[in-house]
From Swiss-Prot:
HAMAP family: Ala_racemase. GO terms for cellular component: cytosol. Keywords: Isomerase, Pyridoxal phosphate. This is Alanine racemase. Substrate binds at R140, M315. The gene is alr. The active site is at K40, Y268.
Amino acid sequence: MVVGVHRPTQLVIDRQALHDNIQAEVTRLASGCELFMVVKANGYGHGAVQVAQVAKEAGATGFCVAILDEALELRAAGFNEPILVLGVTEPEDAPLMAQQHISATVAATDWLVAADAYLALAQPTAPLQVHLGLDTGMGRIGFKTTTELTTAVSYLATHATLNFEGIFTHFATADSPDETYFKQQVAKWQTLTAALKERPRYVHVSNSATSLWHAACNDNMVRFGVAGYGLNPSGTAIPAPYALKPALSLTSQLVHSKQVVAGESVGYGATYTAQQTEWVGTVPIGYADGYERRLQGFHVLVDGQACEIIGRVCMDQLMIRLPHDYARGTRVTLIGRDGDHVITLQEMADYCQTIHYELACGFTSRLPRVYRH
């Protein structure tokens, strides 16, 4: 997709905020515990390569991604740190992963058998590093029984093309005040890992929520994701142990303003009709940029004042009700601070009845990312 550099709409990423969030968590970790920064989905919409660089400077010793292509992007950008692909990859890509020193998540022994066959043919110079995923209650991927786990571990021990580098699970409710299900998963994890005769290099269960609120579970590595971007994993349910600094802002400018009179309508479907004479401004951003159509009725900030989005959000533009006329080029803040007022991703997510993760990841590549500080 084309990046809209000739349009006054941009995501602004605060590198210092990223650094402060990540460094704050690094300093909380017990001695010997490493932080891998999760930069999947283009760094939660913030830019994977740029976030990885800041994370490295802040003390991260490795990275986690969702798919192999994201790992290859980091390697192409010059990162030599360990990279773990959290999703299941194709066995035929095992030689490429071994060659690029990218670690694979494995959720079934038949994957190991298939990957071993490809590795035996390709004969890479190093074995494929493997992290065994355990399904302790997420219901997504992973080994569920002790028998399944020990079978996989035995296979790894007898095949030189594969190296047992790590083992992990993922908690479904670590961001909830109710710890009942979380404790059930912890117990299942402990039961499964008790079957191991030897621990691998990395043992990790902690996502952002677990590391923030259940640090005793951290073991020797945490997968630090959404909190590194300054977003509370629980939304507003649980206070963070330190101040998280949101790193993402979204700004634009007015490209047009006009006066409408009572009875005139605005936008597709004529869903908004003026009840009196008022000023309407047009902002060049829409749902093609990831600004949700369901944000009709929400607000943006103009000159520090909240201005309602009127009519439906269009593909490329939206309209707002202004208190008075403003000049073309006047700044519009869609996420972030303007004067004494601030719009947060959490506030937007609440309005859309979703989570801030979804909104952050949904901003498309048509929006340029500008990095500051």
